[in-house]
Amino acid sequence: MLKIGVFGCGAIGTELCKAIDSGHIEVELYAVYDRHEQSIINLKEQLKNTDPKVLEIVEMVKHVDLVVECASQQAVYDVVPTTLHAKCDVMVISVGAFADKKLLDTTFDIAKEYGCKIYFPSGAIVGLDGLKSASAASIYSVTLTTQKHPRSFEGAPYIVQNNIDLDSIKGKTVLFEGMASEAVKAFPSNVNVAASLSIAGIGFDKTKVKIIANPALTRNIHEITVEGEFGMFTTRVENVPAPSNPKTSYLAALSAISTLKKIADPLQVGT
């Protein structure tokens, strides 16, 4: 049975640990960590059948087969290389960190050197399977349009740097239009999906992103349009926000659970 370490005990990390604890995923939850001690306490209070050790990443990788990063883009810079150097596989939730091409290239090189796997869940979108299939031929364009309630963008670097008053937004308002390379840095907690699209498709500098604040919404909406040699497809998903964090879509947590289940499952279905 795979031994798992979960680094980051926020919304996604907590849902993932609960899924393991309930027996939904047949792996062993060996260790967890979060820089906020209270987050660890809150997580452990929700676990009924397991009592994982609390280990920092350097110790965690000595005992597990797979580390799941659920912390932040900044954490990726330490967690991922440390994990791969220890010859452990890694699942990355904060995929937006890989807009840094140097980090992306270095990470892939380390993984190849040590024979490790890096897993990027689909997150809060649908359509990555189609995009991956389409990438076998030429892709002309990939566009992501994200709509969320204004409060979902609180604290985002782009909002802070531009002194945007989210409370003053009364109608549908475009906050950002640009490339994924800029979007994942401007809204690191909101559009990790742009990173997944970029890596699976035509890259961070060619993937277009539009971010809209809409106070009428109670769900997070992601629309994707892909055009290429194959033709064209559009997907739209309306996500319920995660109960503990409105910046995160519940589907993102479910995607992490599904990815881990697929890793542990001998039967593989789909692209």
From Swiss-Prot:
GO biological process, one term: NAD biosynthetic process
Species, as recorded: Methanococcoides burtonii (strain DSM 6242 / NBRC 107633 / OCM 468 / ACE-M)
Family matches, as Pfam families: Asp_DH_C (PF01958), NAD_binding_3 (PF03447)
Active site: H222
Pathway entry: Cofactor biosynthesis; NAD(+) biosynthesis; iminoaspartate from L-aspartate (dehydrogenase route): step 1/1
EC numbers on record: 1.4.1.21
Keywords assigned: NAD, NADP, Oxidoreductase, Pyridine nucleotide biosynthesis
Annotated residues for binding of NAD(+): A124, N192
GO molecular function, one term: NADP binding
Catalytically driven reaction(s): L-aspartate + NADP(+) + H2O = oxaloacetate + NH4(+) + NADPH + H(+); L-aspartate + NAD(+) + H2O = oxaloacetate + NH4(+) + NADH + H(+)
Chain's role: Specifically catalyzes the NAD or NADP-dependent dehydrogenation of L-aspartate to iminoaspartate.
Protein name: L-aspartate dehydrogenase
Enzyme class, UniProt record, top EC level: oxidoreductase
Note: The iminoaspartate product is unstable in aqueous solution and can decompose to oxaloacetate and ammonia.
Designated gene of the protein: nadX
Family: Belongs to the L-aspartate dehydrogenase family.
